[in-house]
């Protein structure tokens, strides 16, 4: 059944039943899960597939959505970026899913964008990213740079007195764009360009000896060095092991990571990583009743040794907002759900409330955590909710842009010329 005919059927059912419940032939409602279960990103993405299965089970136990049970349709794009696009098309045209929750890397998301925009699919993307994008067909439930990268850099500057920066990233669009933003930001804060070392490595990189030696050498003049890491996937294991082998402690050269959380640390001996940092919008150690309930449910579903992390919370928030939006709209049709998403609120797991903004980003708190023995984090800094900014203020070409799908109907709006630059996301 096409999305259009499904919408017509839903509307007819609403008229007949008077309660907005989907008619029998529209059941089950299908939820696509697009996460790598093999390849270099499986270390991070497999757990996101698992949490989606838990959330679907929980919702079905509550009666489903619009009178229908939910059915999770899981595919494995295998850390293969073109395959993400193929699997997204398969989910929408063959499986006829009503919504997709998926992706980790930005290169995989950008591979999917043309497909979901062509077919009017709906993607909930749960991971921090570089910004510089706002698609009509994506809700970005992870952090934009102003909700992670910029606050973490401020912490290095203001709290740790870092004077020289090593920006280490995996070689793809998220680290490169984020580091472009950070380099511009650091220079605006008085850091000399020659005191900023930038290095990129491939996915799955394992030989870190030379790069760690280069980072150590930055401090030969006695200035405090700090590492900002946008390294993704299993390459993180080798990086942290090499730091330990080189005898580099957090007191010597602190590292703040944007893609390392509880899941990535669960496979490491963290005793020599104590004191290094990560910036997210959630940590498992958050001491709230809601988080305790979530952790208990997760361990019961997935196993006592399993941990929670930030992108899991993003899926938790996004999924529940989608359920509430579909319920409010009386339909799972994409355009109806999208319209009902704006202003959706849902309690986050750290004690506040997530709010969906007209730019398809969330208002979320910024947390900085310090690695402790055992692979958990001490939360050492937490803000109130920060509104996600799709277009950074720290790149001149982006500072004039804004996104407002609710009132302006545009994700790339020039505030100076008062025109919509473009509607599709082939930036």
Label each region the model flagged.
Residues 32-51, 75-82, 104-107, 171-176, ...:
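Extracytoplasmic "Venus flytrap"
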Residues 22-33, 64-69, 157-163:
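Immediate post-signal peptide segment of exported/extracytoplasmic ligand-binding proteins
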Residues 43-50, 57-58, 62-132, 141, ...:
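Beta-alpha junction/loop-to-helix N-cap segments that form part of ligand/metal-binding clefts
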Residues 1-24:
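Gram-negative bacterial Sec-dependent N-terminal signal peptides
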Residues 29, 345-427:
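Solvent-exposed, acidic/polar segments of extracytosolic/periplasmic ligand-binding ectodomains
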Residues 242-316, 326-332, 386-417, 421-423:
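Extracellular/periplasmic periplasmic-binding protein-like sensory domains
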Residues 91-103, 124-126, 164-169, 222-233, ...:
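Periplasmic-binding protein-like
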Residues 86, 130-131, 137-246, 285-293:
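Extracellular/periplasmic Venus flytrap/periplasmic-binding protein
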